[in-house]
UniProtKB/Swiss-Prot annotation:
Iron in keyword set: yes
Protein name: Galactose-1-phosphate uridylyltransferase
Positions with a binding annotation for Fe cation: E183, H282, H297, H299
Organism of derivation: Haemophilus influenzae (strain ATCC 51907 / DSM 11121 / KW20 / Rd)
Gene3D superfamilies assigned: HIT-like
Top-level enzyme category: transferase
Signal sequence range: none
Cofactor(s), by name: Zn(2+)
Length: 349
């Protein structure tokens, strides 16, 4: 006799309507022993100022240019930009196997604060508000010239961060990147088929179910999406229809700072380490269309799985077949939800 399906025990696939892909969920594998790579935990106390850091105030960058003695978030042109403003278009090819297109743009760096030691969860909500204001200013400026502006942060050496001073990046593109183009298509198709906005509908469903919500504030929710790929992946969304960061009300912007601090604090508290991740915002492009199908959201993709030293590797089947995870989204959300919103470094002894 076939056993009844149990999502915490039996392998199954979950569909991600946002990117039109499936993920294999294998919860029984979470019980397997681990004898693989153990990454060294680097938890030494960082100074608030490092004279050797290229990003600290008044220091010389690798190009020889001096940083100002900044006291709030500081933005500058990336010294090793992946995109250039004046890039000629390649010649058109008639061969369908050898196609290329023009890629113009700009790359900028945003230092979140002058303090070398403070990542987002260690900043105050007011300090994070200042970061959000700069994000919004950059979107307005760059969105006037480019159809896509990507705000993101790679936190930690495990995510390829090349400088320990807490910072993010802002890339402006003359084109829609692959992930964004896919989300644009799926959200547009959903609106045409259902007459409503996909991620607005999704927020309503998750608010009713509550089992995958990690943090909820007045205007925002952070949750482990039903279709999550990374072990403790989260999706951050406003509760109402908002297409871009620049369209947030003052109250929504302030509340975004609150939930960013709470969510990233829970991440750090999970394994009591500075939790690595890649995060970024997706929102309506600056392409002259109404983009009613779009809903602002942020993706957090952290690699850690079992501890501060054991991470998820996207290899083998994930590279050649489809994405796979062990822990269910509901189990991951339960663990994150139960964590304190007071950072482990700030707890009273």
């Amino acid at each position: 006799m076939t056993a009844l399906f149990e999502p915490t025990e039996h392998p199954h696939r979950r569909y991600n309507p946002l990117i039109d892909q499936w993920v294999l969920v294998s919860p029984h594998r979470a019980k397997r022993p681990w004898q693989g790579q153990q990454e060294k935990v680097n938890e030494e106390q960082k100074p608030s100022y490092d004279p050797t850091c290229y990003l600290c105030p008044s220091n010389k960058r690798i190009t020889g240019e001096l940083n100002p003695d900044y006291r709030k978030p500081y933005v500058f042109k990336n010294d090793f930009s992946a995109l250039l403003e004046d890039t000629p278009a390649p010649e058109k090819s008639s061969d369908p196997l050898f196609q290329s297109s023009q890629a113009r743009g700009e790359s900028r760096v945003i230092c979140f604060s002058p303090d070398h030691s403070k990542t987002l969860p260690l900043l105050t909500a007011l300090e994070i508000e200042e970061v959000i204001k700069v994000w919004q200013e950059q979107l307005r400026e760059l969105g006037a010239k480019y159809q896509w502006v990507q705000i993101f942060e790679n936190k930690g050496a495990a995510m390829g961060c090349s400088n320990p001073h807490p910072h993010g990046q802002i890339w402006a593109n003359s084109f829609l990147p692959n992930e964004v183009a896919r989300e644009d298509r799926t959200q547009r198709d959903y609106l045409l088929k259902h007459g409503s906005v996909m991620l607005v509908d999704y927020v309503k469903r998750e608010l009713a179910l509550k089992e995958r919500i990690v943090v909820e504030t007045e205007h925002w929710i952070a949750l482990v999406p039903y279709w999550a790929i990374w072990p403790f992946e989260t999706l951050l969304l406003p509760k109402t229809h908002v297409k871009r960061l620049t369209e947030l009300s003052d109250e929504q912007s302030k509340d975004l700072a609150v939930i960013l601090k709470k969510l990233t604090t829970k991440y750090d508290n999970l394994f009591e380490t500075s939790f690595p991740y890649s995060m970024g915002f997706h929102a309506a492009p600056f392409n002259g269309e109404d983009n009613e199908h779009w809903q602002l959201h942020a993706h957090f993709y952290p690699p850690l799985l079992r501890s501060a030293t054991v991470r998820k590797f996207m290899v083998g089947y994930e590279m050649l077949g489809e994405n796979q995870r062990d822990l269910t989204a509901e189990q991951a959300a339960e663990r994150l939800r139960a964590l304190s919103e007071v950072h482990y470094k700030e707890r009273t002894k």
